[in-house]
Each structure stands twice: as C-alpha cells, then as structure tokens.
Amino acid sequence: MMKKFAKWLEVLLMICLMLTACTPASQQPTGNSEAQVENLAKLCKVWGYVKYTHPVFLLGEKDWDEELLKLIPAVSEADSDEVNRILHEWFLSLGEIDYGMATSISTLQEDKLCVQADISWIKDIAYLGKDLSEDIQLLGPIPSIYRENAPVKFTANPMGTRVTDFSNEALYENMDYGDQGYRLLGLFRLWNAMEYYYPYLDILDNNWHDLLPEYIARMLEGKNQESYELTIASLSAKLQDAHVALYNSKYTILEAGIYGVPVKIMQAEGEIVVTEVLEDDCPLQRGDIIRELDGKNIRDILAERMEYFSVTTEKKFINKIGHFLLRSNDKNIELTISRDGIEQTVSVEGEMAYYSMLETAEQPYQILNGNIGLLNPAALQAGSLSSLMNKLMSTNGLVIDLRQYPSNYVVYDLAEYLVDGVKPFLICAVPTESNPGAFLKNIKYSGKQENANVERYEKPVVVLMNEKTQSQAEYTIMSIRNGENVTVMGENSVGSDGDVAYLPLPGGMNLSFSSQGIYTSDGGQTQRVGLAPDIEVHPTIEGIKAGRDELMEAAVDYILSQNEN
C-alpha cells in the first residue's frame, strides 16, 4: 500500500514541480533575494543528506542529480513557508526506506569515532517543519549494502585502507554554464561531498555551513564557464588542503596565467627567492629576491592565487602554488627583483610549461664525505630498498632526504631498518559506510617484526624535511621517526597527508582532496600544522646564492658530531 501511495505522490509532485518550474532554471528571474538563497541552502542540505543515506539512491534506483534539477526551480521560486512542504512531498515520493538484502549494521565504538558532519539541523523542527524533520530522521545508520550504483562507494588501497570512490557521479562535460540548475548542481555536489567525506572540517578557518549561502549567491550571479569554474575553485580553496586540486579547469589556469617563469623558488628569511634557473636564456640568477611581477607586488599576487588554489596556511604555499605564482598571460614578463641589495627590473620570456617546485634526484643513493650514506626516496625503484640498505649498512651515518616525494611506497619497509620493535606511529581516520560524516580511527604500527629477517641500521640517521614535504613523505617520516637513532631536521612540513579521493564535477572537472584523517599516535593534529623537526635548520639567501644545500650540510655535521661522542 505504501509503495502505491508513494508512486501516486511522485506523480502528483511531478505535476506540481512542472507547474512551478515551467521556465528553465537559466531563465529564472535574476534578482537573488536572501530568502531565495536560504531556501536553496536548505535544499542543498536536505538533498545531500538524503542522497547519501536513502536506499533509493544508494541502490541506484533513482538519479540523484535528476531529482535535484527538478527541485531547484520549484524551491528557488517558492515562498519560505512552502519550501518545507515541497521537500517533504519530494521525500515521501522516494518511497519506503528499504535497503533490500542488507546485512546488519555494525556497531561503532564511540571512542574511535571522529564526527565531522553537522547534521543537527535535521532535528530542528523550526527549520524543517515537523513532518520533514521527523521523516528524514528515519534514515538513521546505513546497513552494509551493495553500493555499486551508489553516489559514493568504498574501495581499498594496496594497504587495505578504505578509500572513498565517487566514480558514479556524472561529469556533464557539455553542460550549459548559464543554466542555474547545473551551476547549483556542481556547487551542491561539492559542498555535500566535503560535508560528509572530508575529514578536516573542524579545523578550517571558515565554518563550512556559513560558506554555503555565500557561494550560492555567487553561483546565481554568474552566467558563464569562467564564473562557474572560479566559484568552484574558490570554495574548494577554503578546504585549506594541499591535496586539493581542480583538474581540467580552463579558467583556473587562465587566472594564474599560461606563461611561466622558468625557475624554482623557495622561501628564505621571509623572502621569495630563486633557487634554480631552468633555462639558459633566463636572466634571473640564484639568490634573486622576487619583489614584483608585471608591476604588482608579489605578495598581492600570492593573495590572489590563494583565492583559487588551496594551501594549508598562508606561510606554506611553495609546494602547492609555487609553480602558479610566477605566471602571466603575457609572454614577456616583467619582474622586479633584488640582487645584491639593488632593485632592478628584468624582462623574462615566459614558457608554456609548469615547473615543479619539488626536489628531485637522479641516483637512489650516494656516499658522501665521511662515509655518510644518502638515500634519495624520489629515485627509489620498486623493490630496491633491501639491496640499497645492504650497501648502506657499512656507512657511518645515513641521511634520508624527504624534501623529495617518494617514487615508491617504502613507509613500512624503511621503518623495519630503523625502528626496533613494532610501535604505533599514527592514527588514520577513514570514512564509515554506516554513518556519512563519521570517520573511524585506526592505529597504524611500524617497525621491525620479531621474526623479520632485516638487519637494523645502528648508526645516526638524519631525516630532512622542509616546506615542500607533503603527503607520503610526511607519512614516511611519521613511520620512521620512532627509531632510537633517528633525528628529523629542517623546516616544518606542509601538513596534508592521507589517501586522495577524486570528486567528478559538472563541466568535466575533477576535484582531488584528502579523504582520510591523519593524526599523531597520541591523537595530535597534523593537517595544516604539519610535522615539526627535532632540530630546526633554515636556508639563507646567501647560502642559496652560493649554491649551498644548508640543510644537507647541517645533517652531515650532526652525524659527524654524533660519531665523535
């Protein structure tokens, strides 16, 4: 009987929506009142919560995007008092809450949960009305179901850790950028995916819920591809996550500029400094301090870039947007620099290329002066660590350069040589299947197993890191710094770790973001704050100018001093 009623109600709702939405969303009146924005924000929240919890969507029986596109014009033009009725009738039209051949719900231990989503609003009768509030609360925890056709499913990475999968989301590569429906669909998809599957909402500078009405208004005001892409980019930048990147976004790239200055840069003594010149005809030199680009202060340009490119903090931008900073849409780029204390302007021919700020290495290992070994994770070949460590066993000390990004996963294998016994090194919070917005914490261990046929490296070990150390490099440091003879040296790391998930977005774009929470073994924060070195060492402008690697020098000196004691 309930299914027949739901079917009848769905037909009735369709008629109502057709009557209230007889004009396309793109032709709706353009005056965006505060009430309209509030109504659309409510629609976003209700649709998103239902999308990730109702069996009709989780089992792939209805198209969640199609349902939203039908609702947008009706809700957009409705009086505030009507919105709750429209949403409640829509909710009832979805049918019974029946998960089919589902298994029982796993009980989650409260002390292992990290809850990010704020769903207190579903119990707010004043906000939703009594009927909608009571009915939407029936969606409760989700049993284990077949999610192959769901808006979100879960796979496992090579280490067996759960990873969020949004591959069932449609890209709409040929969308009409003037259609308010599809513009809002992109915004609502992004907002809800982060609300329920981004593990760090609690440490953002902005409240995620407060941002929603602001970006709805921005999306309604725009009419073209540029405004759509930049609105999406701007909201994603608010995640303050160095894993965030918006792929296949034409106007985000144009905002930075298509021509780049062929150099590498870093921060030293509070300045943005050239560390390497990559083209012979480039007039810049190592040690040049960047002051202006095309007549604009470089710090002002940095602030403009951070509107659309996500960084963990204002101070940690090199690894993420360093290659977007010195760019222009003019091929001839004017740079004002300071060289030897004298300011001058030079003209640089820009290149249509992107220059990575990451450190690289050609050889997987070297023997430095004093018989000190150097391990370059960026050049490690798969399966080669064992033979390399055998060659390095006779050295008087070891430097592991994790200013580089590891080319292969050596988190646990490397720890077996450096950490005596198995020890906890971090807590990983992964999304739960039963409770969208909740993450389950698991302790990760590393070190030498009792029966492992691995010789422990006994000499002093220095691990180098800096403002470019991110993600797997940070994970590796956390795994090995428990070693008795291991010292971490250099600068604070970026603070973006854990597996990356990808969210398809209308317009053919994809958004990457950190999908797991990574904490220290005692539960401390790592995201945004990064890892702190045991010994701080910073590069100097004079050192850069002279071509010195001051962090490497400090590492070698430290090992030599330890061997003298």
Model-derived regions: residue spans:
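PDZ-domain C-terminal substructure recognizer with occasional recognition of PDZ-binding tails
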Residues: 81-97, 101, 221-246, 306-357
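Amphipathic alpha-helical substructures
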Residues: 56-88, 198-243
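PDZ/PDZ-like domain segments forming the peptide/carboxylate-binding groove
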Residues: 35-36, 44, 48, 112-159, ...
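Bacterial lipoprotein signal-peptidase II cleavage site
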Residues: 23-28
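Cleft-lining beta-strand/loop regions that shape enzyme active-site pockets
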Residues: 35, 50-51, 59-63, 73-76, ...
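C-terminal motif of bacterial Sec signal peptides marking the signal peptidase cleavage site
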Residues: 19-21
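Bacterial N-terminal signal peptides that target proteins for export
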Residues: 2-9
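Conserved PDZ fold ligand-binding element
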Residues: 46, 50-54, 72, 190, ...
